[in-house]
């Protein structure tokens, strides 16, 4: 190839690169301009205004202080001209109809389905996040579907599901959207389920609890250092959340993903079980699940199934009645046993209930098992 042709091809290549860059920059600027138009978004609840158009979000314990143009840690709330806006209201990142057992809820409507939705964002950053593709991104970083609360409830009813589940990412940070959907869902006769990390301030928690039937907490580990190192959050606010949920009468289940060498020590498991029994009672279901390498924690091997089984045994030794296992092949860990007779009350295989021997929440011997059964 002659030098002249080489120069022509080099010039064309440079023009292509520059043109692509200009296009990407213009698209980014278009997004930014749209975001500066408050009419496009829903004003947030739970925030304070300060001098200089600074705001402080009071939805979760991060208590982000934001100058105009700044997003919160959650990537879902933004200060626009001195007001805080939800940037994810009405923007669904994913939606599915799932077995309720998948959440997992084991004491809620066995064998029924939940219309499950999520927006983008999360207010903590777990190194082992299972849904990081939507939880650790901004709303403009992925495709979303616009849907009003009325449309969401309509789709849930049309799907034949008996519940709406706010799940996959962190529903707390789409608080206004969840609240509006939950109100309509309750009025339409649907159950409402939160699958959350529990990182929320008390005032908004107490408001949302008025419209929620079941709350599942993804409890990261009974250790403050683990919370700080692995999630950027803190332990105490989550403990307070669980106490408030229990005191409200809303159904509560707890799940802990066990990670080798991080949150799987016997004393951590025993401490958690004792705390649950002392503060929440012996009938709150506790699930232990097996970790598989994901997101930024790829250098830790999958948790041995024996670790999950041992955690269940320890929690039961401490007096908890309903302790389950997940992500392992261990049938006893998927069965609800009648606490009086020891007989099988509900048998599950993976995400599905294959036998339900309860009658209005009671075993064959008449012993009541707590939960939401109809």
Identify what each model region corresponds to.
Residues 110-120, 124-159:
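Glycine-rich active-site/cofactor-binding loop and its immediate structural neighborhood
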Residues 45, 72, 82, 87, ...:
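Flexible, active-site-adjacent loop/turn segments at secondary-structure boundaries
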Residues 146-306, 311:
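Conserved AdoMet/S-adenosylmethionine-binding subsite of the radical SAM
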Residues 73-83, 87-95, 140-150, 352-365:
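Short cysteine/histidine-rich metal-coordination sites, predominantly Zn2+-binding motifs
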Residues 68-71, 85, 128, 137-140, ...:
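Generic domain-boundary/flexible-linker signal
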């Amino acid at each position: 190839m002659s030098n002249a042709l080489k120069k022509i091809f080099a010039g064309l290549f440079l023009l292509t690169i520059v043109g692509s860059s200009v296009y990407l920059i213009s698209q980014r600027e278009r997004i930014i301009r749209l975001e500066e138009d408050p009419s496009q978004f829903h004003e947030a609840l739970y925030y304070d205004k300060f001098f200089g158009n600074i705001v402080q979000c009071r939805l979760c314990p991060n208590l982000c202080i934001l100058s105009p143009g700044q997003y919160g840690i959650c990537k879902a709330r933004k200060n626009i001209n001195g007001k805080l806006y939800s940037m994810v209201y009405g923007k669904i990142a994913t939606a599915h109809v799932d077995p309720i057992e998948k959440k997992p809820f084991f004491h809620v409507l066995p064998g029924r389905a939940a219309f499950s939705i999520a927006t983008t964002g999360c207010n903590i950053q777990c190194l082992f996040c299972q849904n990081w593709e939507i939880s650790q991104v901004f709303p403009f970083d992925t495709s979303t579907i616009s849907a009003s609360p009325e449309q969401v409830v309509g789709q849930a009813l049309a799907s034949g599901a008996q519940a709406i589940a706010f799940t996959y990412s962190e529903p707390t940070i789409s608080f206004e959207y969840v609240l509006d959907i939950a109100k309509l869902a309750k009025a339409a006769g649907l159950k409402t389920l939160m699958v959350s990390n529990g990182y929320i301030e008390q005032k908004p928690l107490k408001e949302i609890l008025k419209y929620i039937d079941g709350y599942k907490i993804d409890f990261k580990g009974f250790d403050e250092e683990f919370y700080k190192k692995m999630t950027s959050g803190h332990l105490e606010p989550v403990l307070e959340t669980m106490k408030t949920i229990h005191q409200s009468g809303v159904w509560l289940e707890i799940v802990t993903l066990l990670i080798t060498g991080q949150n799987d020590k016997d004393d951590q498991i025993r401490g958690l079980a004792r705390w649950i029994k002392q503060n929440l009672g012996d009938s709150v279901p506790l699930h232990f699940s097996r970790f598989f390498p994901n997101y930024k924690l790829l250098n830790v091997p999958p948790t041995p199934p024996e670790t999950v089984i041992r955690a269940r045994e320890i929690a039961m030794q401490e007096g908890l009645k309903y302790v389950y296992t997940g992500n392992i092949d261990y049938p006893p860990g998927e069965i609800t046993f009648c606490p009086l007779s020891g007989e099988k009350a509900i048998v599950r295989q993976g995400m599905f209930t294959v036998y339900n021997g309860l009658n209005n929440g009671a075993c064959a011997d008449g012993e009541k098992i707590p939960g939401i059964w109809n």
